Amino acid sequence: MKNWRLNNVTPSAFEKTGPIPRSITKTFEKFKKELDPNSESEVIEEFRVSRYQTAASIKYLLLLITVPLIVNQISKSFVFSPFVDYFWNDNQNDIFLNESQEERAFSELQRFEEKIHFEILIGQSPPLSQESIDKEIKHKAVELAQYYVQESTDAMKNLLADVLAFVTFVYLIVTGRRQISVLKSFVNELIYGLSDTAKAFLIILFTDIFVGFHSTHGWEVVLENGLRHFGLPENRDLIFLFIATFPVVLDTVFKYWIFRYLNQVSPSAVATYKDMNE
């Protein structure tokens, strides 16, 4: 990993939240600097530090995103794919990994058979003998078997590749603690630089997306696709239990963060949020 130059970062980049709202302290510091005769050189130095902090944060953020993705795709295509295909084709006779796949396959085969009979009844297809119908159904069953074998092997590849990508991501986090501090400071400065209306808008947007009234449908889609991605059974009871509990916990965390943290660093943003949310 590249050796990041962090010597020029001032302690203000890592400042913690105090009992006095940050907006008030920053206003006082700004007024104090305007009266300082050496303020011009300090402004230039702060600009250089800010520019370095921005560049370092963007580089590290891109590193956190691209490296795990590259590891995921390369390991899946060139390492796990040949291994899983060989293991599944030689040692595995099952087509499905779970009952959810079976239900989807049987339902699709049943719809295909009903479609054939329906098209014959309304005259869209010529009359077929039972032997021809059975032949069409058998051909469809073979197609479905091939499709779900591929889905099963892809699920195993996804699981192995995602685990390796997650380990890579954790390694980058653990070995880049100083870069994480710079990135955290950069994000804080970016958020604090927004207007109170923009802060309140973003809070309302994220809370409505993740814990709003219509968020349950989104969580359901995400969970179903996530379980299917890893080849896990799509247990409806488990999905509904998660939807009934997790958004509530997340909403509590949001409210606690607003009360405990945001209320100290930006009271005006909290007031704007309450006015917009009413």
From Swiss-Prot:
GO biological process: potassium ion transport
Keywords attached to this entry: Antiport, Chloroplast, Hydrogen ion transport, Ion transport, Membrane, Plastid, Plastid inner membrane, Potassium, Potassium transport, Transmembrane, Transmembrane helix, Transport
GO molecular function: antiporter activity; proton transmembrane transporter activity
Main location: plastid
Top-level taxonomic group: Eukaryota
Bilayer-crossing regions: 60-80, 155-175, 201-221, 239-259
Compartments where located: Plastid, Chloroplast inner membrane
Purpose: Contributes to K(+)/H(+) antiport activity by supporting proton efflux to control proton extrusion and homeostasis in chloroplasts in a light-dependent manner to modulate photosynthesis. Prevents excessive induction of non-photochemical quenching (NPQ) under continuous-light conditions. Indirectly promotes efficient inorganic carbon uptake into chloroplasts.
UniProt-recorded name of the protein: Potassium/proton antiporter CemA
Lineage: Eukaryota, Cryptophyceae, Pyrenomonadales, Pyrenomonadaceae, Rhodomonas
Gene name as annotated: cemA
